[in-house]
Amino acid sequence: MGILEKISEIEKEIARTQKNKATEYHLGLLKAKLAKYRAQLLEPSKSSSSKGEGFDVMKSGDARVALIGFPSVGKSTFLSLMTSTASEAASYEFTTLTCIPGVIEYKGANIQLLDLPGIIEGAAQGKGRGRQVIAVARTADVVIMMLDATKGEVQRSLLEKELESVGIRLNKHKPNIYFKPKKGGGISFNSTVTLTQCSEKLVQLILHEYKIFNAEVLFREDCSPDEFIDVIVGNRVYMPCLYVYNKIDQISMEEVDRLARKPDSVVISCGMKLNLDYLLEMLWEYLALTCIYTKKRGQRPDFTDAIILRKGASVEHVCHRIHRSLASQFKYALVWGTSTKYSPQRVGLTHTMEHEDVIQIVKK
């Protein structure tokens, strides 16, 4: 029996098993086996030597955004509107066959936008260009899931299921579980909270399925067996996702209002160029970027060339971005902006910078 058949059998078994206290260990084991087989399926096959055109895209700019969606939902049109890149757009499926990068210039930052080939159902099993598409999607900072507003719910649940099965967790945080395999001493299990979904016995069963008999496990939050399996496997990617409903000009106002109120969702129309500016604002928020401007002594700040860093970056991060040896020569910095009590304020390396702050670094 091949891996796909085994996965199918386990999925059927999970679907027909009632969820209750008596079956929780059985379900936990099935989920562990399922995660194991899916991980095997995603390992690159040794026989495939051809890399495939247009997939080894070099990361450039200050952030990377992956544009994911079914064929013909408007991804190529969106890329053409947002960037200067022309991605072939047509009203038939599979127009985009390779990964097309473009750059959005927004608030002084260069954001790389990747138009990935339309994901089809079964991409996790390597159908279409699925496996390559997913490999590129895992390197992104944010995912924009482009959906057709006329059939958005069906597309959304299918795509979420596909991405979930390849280890991409959307709008979730990493489970707060400490896990460390050891050479001996058996399994040490502790928790700092009351567990309602996992027990010590279930944790041991899951670990034994992965041939782990000696480990230290500490639950710092109430997690499900699935989340514990994610911690064991370790190759999961947790990233923010914006659900973008395109073609809202083809649905009723009531439906537009319902979709717009959903969490992490934006409604747009590429054809009529509606709400694209709001989408950019939301994208900036999800990327959590900060622009920092530099100033030389006795000169005006340079507002043409910003340093782009993650929100919460410190003066030390700014030093490393300018030059790797600058932090070791650092004496103090003068900062103008919202992060200071008064301008300019003399600060040290640990001072947290805010958006559009101006900094002047003084060396020893």
From Swiss-Prot:
Its EC number is 3.6.5.-. Its cofactor is Mg(2+). The modification (3S)-3-hydroxylysine is found at residue 21. Pfam families: MMR_HSR1 (PF01926), MMR_HSR1_Xtn (PF16897), TGS (PF02824). The keyword Magnesium applies. One of its GO terms (biological process) is cytoplasmic translation. Keywords: Cytoplasm, GTP-binding, Hydrolase, Hydroxylation, Magnesium, Metal-binding, Nucleotide-binding, Nucleus, Ubl conjugation. GO terms for molecular function: GTP binding; GTPase activity; metal ion binding. The keyword Endoplasmic reticulum does not apply. Coiled coil: none annotated. It catalyses: GTP + H2O = GDP + phosphate + H(+). It is found in: Nucleus; Cytoplasm. Belongs to the TRAFAC class OBG-HflX-like GTPase superfamily. OBG GTPase family. Interacts with RWDD1; this interaction confers protection to polyubiquitination and proteolytic degradation. Interacts with JMJD7; this interaction is direct. This is Developmentally-regulated GTP-binding protein 2.
